[in-house]
């Protein structure tokens, strides 16, 4: 994950544990999502009508995301699932987590610098630094002006794919060089 330190995470975990201890784990409380993720709309300059505008500025991508039958918009997220999400974020935060990641794995952190999940770039660099400080080989790319779904912006997705292909080629030696030369000219 490239979230860095999630805002008010421990308070969310404590609140969700209380909700679950009250027997409401299978329910979906909309105030939970709002308190956990409501801040993610702070930099959305368009009107928030769907509830996922933070993912991408493109309205088509927003609608496609919201209408996906496997997405939380078509089936509310339970309080228990939110607790598990928060616990997962907590587990993958900090130098202690980074030290557990095998150092032989090459890592490519990519995000938009307007992605709230990556704390608008700060969290992505936090994760990168935790990994570097624990002996990892990390490449990081932030795409200026883009939100969460960098691979879905029509004007950016080709660049994202090429950069991923180049990273994999450098790490795995997959022979992408000739393909990249053919299609990049």
Regions flagged by a language model, labelled:
Residues 123-130, 160:
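A general structural detector for well-ordered alpha-helical segments in enzyme core domains, enriched
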Residues 103, 108-111, 115:
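Short beta-strand/loop motif that positions the catalytic acidic residue
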Residues 114-126:
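Conserved alpha/beta-hydrolase "acid-adjacent" motif
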Residues 132-185:
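Catalytic active-site module of serine/aspartate enzymes centered on a nucleophile-bearing elbow/loop
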Residues 1-76:
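Alpha/beta-hydrolase-fold enzymes
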Residues 98-103, 133-134:
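Short, conserved loop/helix-junction motifs that constitute active-site signature segments
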Residues 1-3, 110, 144:
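Alpha/beta-hydrolase-fold catalytic nucleophile elbow
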Residues 71, 76-99:
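Active-site nucleophile elbow and catalytic-triad environment of alpha/beta-hydrolase enzymes
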